[in-house]
Amino acid sequence: MGIKGLTGLLSENAPKCMKDHEMKTLFGRKVAIDASMSIYQFLIAVRQQDGQMLMNESGDVTSHLMGFFYRTIRMVDHGIKPCYIFDGKPPELKGSVLAKRFARREEAKEGEEEAKETGTAEDVDKLARRQVRVTREHNEECKKLLSLMGIPVVTAPGEAEAQCAELARAGKVYAAGSEDMDTLTFNSPILLRHLTFSEAKKMPISEIHLDVALRDLEMSMDQFIELCILLGCDYLEPCKGIGPKTALKLMREHGTLGKVVEHIRGKMAEKAEEIKAAADEEAEAEAEAEKYDSDPESEEGGETMINSDGEEVPAPSKLKSPKKKAPAKKKKVASSGMQIPEFWPWEEAKQLFMKPDVVNGDDLVLEWKQPDTEGLVEFLCRDKGFNEDRVRAGAAKLSKMLAAKQQGRLDGFFTVKPKEPAAKDTGKGKGKATKGEKRKAEEKGSAKKKSKN
C-alpha cells in the first residue's frame, strides 16, 4: 500500500519535487529496486491473452520470471545498472495488515467462484488478480534468475524499501526504485517509480526528490514521517475522516503528530458526549410520548334512554376520543468526524521508519558480472519452458551492455553553480555613473597616459 494519498498531496503542494522523463535519461545510473514489489507486479501484469498467468507445460507459473528477465534487460539496454532488494522478515506491527490482505484474498477467491457462474469474464479476471500472493518459491526462483543474469541481489533483514533507501543514502546507488511511496518515508533521497512497467504502457519514469518535497512542504524529516503515518501506512489502522488535505492542515496547525492525536481525541470525546446527550434527550421525549399512548378510558353514565319500543334502557357509555401521540423530537447529531483507533501505537510506527532493520550501506558490495548464458538456458528453457533463441538473444544483449564501458554522465564532470545576484547600486542622482560614462572615463585616462609617454 505504501502511504495513502501521498502522491496526490505532493503533486498538489510540492509539484517541483516530481518530474517525469524517459528511461534513457537514467543512463549510467545505479538503482536499488524493490524486488518484492516487482514480483507482485509481474504476477498481476504479465499474463496470457485469456487473463491467466503464464505457465509452462508442467503448470508452473512463469510470469514473474518473464517479467524479471525482459524488463531487467530493457533497463540495462538503456544504460541503467539495477540491483534488486528482497524483503526479509516483516515487523510485528505489520501483522494485522498482512492478516487483512489474506482475508481479502479469501474473499476474492469466493467471489471468483460466484463470478464464474453469474459474472462476466472481466469480473473473473479482476477477482483472480486480487488473489495473487508472492510465495517463498517465487522469491527463490527470482534470486536464482538474477544471479545467472549477473545482477546483484540483496536480501534485506527487514523491509526491502528501507534497504533501498539505505543504499541510496550511502551513495551506493543513485536512487531507490519502487512503487511504494513509503520509500520516501524511509528517507530515500530520490525515488524512481514505473521502472519495471511494461514498455507498452508508455509510462514515463517518475523521479521524486525528498529534499525538494520537504522544502516546499516546509517540514522537517521528522514531521514528514509523522504526516505519512497520519495519511495511512502499512503498520497501523487508518484513521477515519482524515484525508490528505486534512492531514496536512492538522500537521501545519499543531506541528507534531502527538498534538494532532491529542486534538482529535479531544474532539472524539466531545462528540461522544454530544451523542450521549442526544440519546438521553430522545429517550426522555419517547417516555413523555408514552403518556399519550394509553388505552382510551370509558365513562360509565348512570343515565337511561327510551328505545323505539318505548322501553327504558341504559344509555351507552361515553367514550373519550383517543389523543394523538405527540411525536418525539429527535436532536440532530453531526457525523462522527475524525476518528483515531483506540489502539494506535504511532510512536512505534515512527521508530520503524526512523530506525528500520537494514544492513549498513557501506558494508554492502554491489558487483555486476557477465551473465551465465548456459545457466540461463538450462534454468529458463530446460526447466521453465522458455524459448531458447529468445533467451540466448537476451543474454547476448545483457553481456554486451554489461561488458561495455559506460559513457560518463556530463553532470559527473561539471558542477552547476548558482547564479550570483547582481550587486545592488546604491548610488543616487549625479553620483550614479552609467556603464557608458565609465567606459569614456577609462578611455580618456588611457589616452592621457599615451600622450605622456
UniProtKB/Swiss-Prot annotation:
Keywords tagged on the record: DNA damage, DNA repair, DNA replication, Endonuclease, Exonuclease, Hydrolase, Magnesium, Metal-binding, Mitochondrion, Nuclease, Nucleus, Phosphoprotein
GO biological process: base-excision repair; DNA replication, removal of RNA primer; double-strand break repair via nonhomologous end joining; gene conversion at mating-type locus; maintenance of DNA trinucleotide repeats
Enzyme's top EC category: hydrolase
Binding site for Mg(2+) 1: 34, 87, 159, 161
Compositional bias of kind Basic residues: 320-333
Source organism: Cryptococcus neoformans var. neoformans serotype D (strain JEC21 / ATCC MYA-565) (Filobasidiella neoformans)
Cofactor(s) needed by this chain: Mg(2+)
Protein known as: Flap endonuclease 1
PTM comment, free text: Phosphorylated. Phosphorylation upon DNA damage induces relocalization to the nuclear plasma.
Residue span of region I-domain: 123-254
Function: Structure-specific nuclease with 5'-flap endonuclease and 5'-3' exonuclease activities involved in DNA replication and repair. During DNA replication, cleaves the 5'-overhanging flap structure that is generated by displacement synthesis when DNA polymerase encounters the 5'-end of a downstream Okazaki fragment. It enters the flap from the 5'-end and then tracks to cleave the flap base, leaving a nick for ligation. Also involved in the long patch base excision repair (LP-BER) pathway, by cleaving within the apurinic/apyrimidinic (AP) site-terminated flap.
Basic and acidic residues bias spans: 417-446
